[in-house]
């Protein structure tokens, strides 16, 4: 009897040491502090809602999902530090980063640790091109790439402003220079040459010298490869100094903070962005949940939501959370997501991405006529 009781006691201790519901650790990483924190908030909110919905439906492969948030401040060095922390924390999946300059160095760390990465917002072509060339098959996006954005903006300028004098500006970041260079390629291929190609610092506060240079060159169109903070200051100071050139930016302008910082000067600013998922009727119930929580799911909120949900669906199909198996499942089918059907190529890019042109008016970005 003593042996039986002893065996029962050991079994009871073993059961007590095992969680009733094991946790799968995942993370979302982006700029939670600093001048791009508004975009970090989009990633955090999207990931949190996705995890809540996944767990409410029973989790992934019988396990609950535990989310942690990492702050890289869109700084490459901080991004690598955060990525290493995710490795130490035994995270199996990362929805992030936001800035391409963070996603690219972090992807090398995730590869070595066999952590699957899906970025909702990093558009630089080098992220997936270089990763694939190095044998990294566990990097994906739910967004498009700079070559598609550049072609979209370049095509728009060629169609509507072929005889204009164009200044192409960028903030020296992988993202900003990436979209600027891809737009330059599209314009040049279409027979149009830029009148100016200039770099600025994303921390600049006074753009007077640059504005004067554009005035002297009689610039009609500003193609801005950069983020919303500098973009808002540039357009505001341009209008204050009597410079009325049309600004055309990219997806990094897509936050209400752009209009708050730039005020009325942002009216008429154009930008590229994917079709807005928050306006899709099929997402009405999901959008309502965000709004009930007092948050407007603009920008890359639903792209992050989609990244987490697509990972969960692929892990379920693979019956595994191992990065290689989940990656194979992602490439094997089409996933119906909040941002539309997602089908992946061998590099981890979505097939047939779409960007539209939007115009800022009274604090909101609205579709332009097709």
What are these regions (language model features)?
Residues 88-196, 246-268:
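Extracytoplasmic ligand/sensor domains, especially the bilobed periplasmic-binding protein
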Residues 290-301, 310-368:
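Segments of small-molecule ligand-sensing domains
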Residues 18-22:
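Sec/Tat signal peptide C-region and signal peptidase I cleavage site
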Residues 79, 141-165, 206-207, 231-232, ...:
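Hydrophobic alpha-helical segments within soluble ligand-binding/sensing domains
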């Amino acid at each position: 009897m003593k042996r039986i009781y002893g065996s029962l006691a050991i079994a009871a201790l073993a059961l007590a040491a095992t969680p009733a519901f094991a946790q799968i650790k995942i993370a979302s990483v982006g700029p939670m502090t600093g001048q791009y924190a508004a975009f970090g908030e989009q990633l955090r909110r999207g990931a949190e809602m996705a995890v809540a919905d996944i767990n409410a439906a029973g989790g992934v492969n019988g396990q609950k999902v535990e989310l942690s948030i990492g702050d890289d401040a869109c700084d490459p060095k901080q991004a690598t530090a955060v990525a290493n922390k995710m490795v130490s924390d035994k995270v199996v999946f990362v929805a992030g980063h936001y800035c391409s300059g963070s996603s690219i160095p972090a992807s090398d760390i995730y590869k070595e640790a066999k952590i699957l990465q899906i970025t909702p917002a990093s558009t630089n072509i080098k992220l997936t091109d270089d990763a694939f060339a190095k044998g990294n098959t566990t990097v994906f996006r739910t967004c498009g790439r700079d070559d598609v954005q550049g072609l979209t903006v370049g095509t728009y300028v060629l169609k509507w402003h072929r005889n204009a004098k164009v200044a192409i500006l960028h903030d020296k970041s992988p993202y900003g220079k990436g979209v600027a260079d891809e737009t330059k390629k599209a314009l040049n291929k279409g027979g149009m040459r830029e009148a100016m190609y200039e770099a600025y610092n994303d921390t600049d506060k006074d753009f007077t010298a640059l504005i004067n240079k554009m005035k002297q060159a009689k610039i009609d169109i500003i193609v801005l490869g950069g983020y919303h903070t500098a973009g808002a200051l540039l357009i505001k100071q341009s209008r204050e100094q009597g410079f009325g050139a049309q600004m055309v930016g990219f997806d990094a302008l897509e936050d209400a903070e752009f209009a708050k910082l730039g005020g009325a000067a942002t009216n008429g600013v154009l930008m590229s962005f994917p079709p807005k998922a928050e306006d899709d009727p099929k997402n009405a119930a999901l959008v309502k949940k965000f709004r009930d929580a007092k948050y407007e799911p603009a920008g890359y909120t639903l792209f992050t939501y989609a990244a987490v949900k697509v990972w969960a669906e692929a892990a379920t199909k693979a019956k595994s959370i191992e990065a290689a198996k989940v990656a194979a499942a992602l490439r094997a089918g089409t996933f119906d997501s909040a941002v539309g059907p997602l089908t992946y190529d061998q590099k981890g890019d979505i097939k047939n991405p779409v960007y539209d042109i939007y115009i800022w008016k009274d604090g909101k970005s609205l579709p332009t006529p097709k």
